[in-house]
Each structure stands twice: as C-alpha cells, then as structure tokens.
Regions:
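Non-catalytic signal-transmission and effector/linker regions of two-component phosphorelay proteins
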Residues: 1-14, 20-21, 27, 114-130
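Conserved phosphotransfer cores of two-component systems
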Residues: 50-53, 75-82, 103
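Acidic, metal-coordinating helix/loop segments flanking the phosphotransfer/catalytic sites
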Residues: 39-57
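Acidic catalytic/metal-coordinating carboxylates
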Residues: 41-42, 68-71
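Hydrophobic/aromatic residues positioned on beta-strands within the core alpha/beta folds
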Residues: 88-89
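Receiver (REC) domain active-site loop signature in two-component systems and cognate sites
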Residues: 64
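Alpha4 helix (beta4-alpha4-beta5 surface) of REC/receiver domains from two-component response regulators
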Residues: 71, 92-108, 116, 120
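Active-site T/S-Asp motif of two-component receiver
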Residues: 60-61
Length: 130
C-alpha cells in the first residue's frame, strides 16, 4: 500500500443525497479512489448519525426534502462543526460560491459532476482540514 493510499484509507468522506443513484455513483467513485465513505439519504439523516467528528469531508446535494444542504451546513457551523464541504447541484445557476455561508464550503459542482473535478475538490477540502 502506498503512503497516499494509506492516507486515503484513513479518510472518511460523507455523501448526502436524496437520489439513490447519485449517492451510489458518488460512493463508487470516492471508494475507487481509496477513501472510506458513509452515505446518507438526507441532511437530517446525516445530522442525526452523530458521527460528525469522524468525517473529514462532506459531499452534499443542495436541494433535498426536509432540509437543504445549505441549511445543513449552516447548522453544522452553528453547532461548532467545521467539515470541509463540497456541494453538488442540478441547479448550477443558483449555486453558492465557495466560502458562502461558511469558509468550510470548498466547491459547488454541477450534476452530473466531472469525476476529476470532484476528486480535485476532495483533495482541496482535505488540505483545508489540516
């Protein structure tokens, strides 16, 4: 195992999306890059899991029923959690710029997102965490 692969294996990425197929595709991509993943079907599911301290990067849809990705990020910040976050959205015209709402917002990518852009954004997010 290379040092980079070992570092990735010790890193957990949370994926929050209400669309099963998107969540599954993102999980496959992130795992194929050597990261551990945890998936959630809603912002409320993620917040209720109480594993926020174990998450190194958060990938979240913006538009979800119950609570949006933006509302989830605001709640994380309000409760003292600072997880580098990447938003993905089917509505790029309404996407917030990096740093909006919180310096933890690293990127906002359009769906379907380019694999290389997402993986690059994860690397930026992980560097921000350290």
């Amino acid at each position: 195992m290379t040092q980079n692969t070992q570092m990735h294996a010790a890193t957990t990425i949370a994926i929050v999306d209400d669309d099963d197929s998107v969540r599954s595709a993102l999980e496959g991509l992130v795992r194929s890059s050597g990261y551990k993943t945890r998936t959630y079907c809603s912002a409320l599911d993620f917040l209720g899991a109480n594993l926020k301290n174990e998450i190194h990067c958060l990938i979240s849809d913006i538009q979800m029923p119950g609570m949006s990705g933006v509302e989830m990020l605001k709640q994380l910040v309000a409760t003292g959690y600072h997880i580098p976050t990447i938003f993905i959205t089917a509505y790029p015209a309404a996407a917030p710029p990096p740093g909006a709402y919180s310096p933890d917002l690293v990127a906002c990518l359009s769906k379907p997102c380019d694999a290389d852009k997402l993986l690059d954004s994860i690397e930026v997010a992980l560097q921000q965490r350290h």
